């Protein structure tokens, strides 16, 4: 029986490259000259932004988004925390979401059932397995999921006949 997996993952190498490019851009920008501002990537899951003021942290957010888009990473996978300000400066944690959460997986399954396609969807941890009798049904399911607007980027993987 043909099947495929629906996943939501971020390429860690591309993420590292995007953060490095964002740091390089900080070094070359005129409005950040002589300023202690930087991006730090922790375990490929959290990006820490730090700068002397919260205004500069917001500018850094725009730089980070631009670099991620240039590297082909969907910014919907990012969850921006609150800007923490103290005497030493301002910081913001940006969490990189990996995998499909249970609640979102249920929404995906409901969307497939609502489309009345001849496919079955089952939740396997942080991914969703969709099976059907015909390849055309699976292609229709992919089209339905691509058309639907979810708050996370979806990739389709492991297509088997």
From Swiss-Prot:
Record-level GO cellular component terms: cytosol
Result of knocking out the encoding gene: The deletion mutant shows reduced virulence to plants and alteration in biofilm formation. Deletion of the gene also leads to alteration in levels of transcript of a number of genes associated with a large range of biological functions.
Keywords: Nucleotide-binding, Virulence
Family matches, as Gene3D superfamilies: 3.30.70.860, YajQ-like, domain 2 (3.30.70.990)
Residue positions binding 3',3'-c-di-GMP 1: 33
Modulation of this protein's activity: Activity is regulated by cyclic di-GMP. Cyclic di-GMP specifically binds to XC_3703, which inhibits the interaction of the XC_2801-XC_3703 complex with DNA and prevents the transcription of the target genes.
InterPro entries according to UniProt: DUF520 (IPR007551), UPF0234-like_C (IPR035571), UPF0234_N (IPR035570), YajQ-like_sf (IPR036183)
GO molecular function, one term: nucleotide binding
Binding-site residues, 3',3'-c-di-GMP 2: 133, 135-136, 161
Domain notes per entry: Consists of two domains (domain I and domain II) adopting the same topology, which is similar to that of the RNA-recognition motif (RRM). Domain I is composed of the first N-terminal beta-strand and residues 101 to the C-terminus, and domain II includes residues 11-100. Each domain contains a four-stranded antiparallel beta-sheet packed by two helices from one side.
Free-text function comment from the UniProt entry: Cyclic di-GMP effector that regulates bacterial virulence and biofilm formation. Binds bis-(3',5')-cyclic diguanylate (cyclic di-GMP or c-di-GMP), an important bacterial second messenger that controls a wide range of cellular processes. In the absence of cyclic di-GMP, XC_3703 positively affects the binding of the transcriptional regulator XC_2801 to its target genes and influences their transcription. The binding of cyclic di-GMP to XC_3703 inhibits the interaction of the XC_2801-XC_3703 complex with DNA, thus preventing the transcription of the target genes.
Record HAMAP family: YajQ
Subunit structure: Interacts with the LysR-type transcriptional regulator XC_2801.
Name recorded for this polypeptide: Cyclic di-GMP-binding protein XC_3703
Organism: Xanthomonas campestris pv. campestris (strain 8004)
